[in-house]
Amino acid sequence: MSVDKVREYLRSYGLEDRIKEFDISTATVAEAAEAVGVIPARIAKTLTFQSEECGCILVLMAGDAKVDNKKYRARFGVKPHMLTHEDALQYTGHAVGGVCPFAVPDSVPVYLDVSLKRFDTVFPAAGSAASAVRLTCDELERASRSRGWIDVCKGWEEDQ
């Protein structure tokens, strides 16, 4: 089970006790926000994009953010193309709805969008479509082994 793999991975950071599992789906931002009891913007959604270099990249962003094609192209040099559900599972080891930056192969680069920085804590998935993990942005950056903070989103508001 993917959530067990994530729990074991987060143990090395002392964060395994932050995982919450639910009896209801957390596969969408709205479902996760309801289950966790926070505004949707605090859900850190993980999107999987095609990469000619390594097959896949992960970008985590606030639940209210949307990818800005121009910003994405400026950052990565290509138009953003989401992976299929099958490819997302193949590259990350997590099924869509539970995709997260934890316990993914080292070859998969992870980036964090600045839309997350306005919150003290955020809630990415933890490997299943019925889980979440509460992390500060610093903890998320460290545990995801992020390659850094980027600005590729639009539609979010700084003061939420």
Regions found by a protein language model. Name each.
Residues 1-160:
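Extended, low-hydrophobicity, polar/charged segments
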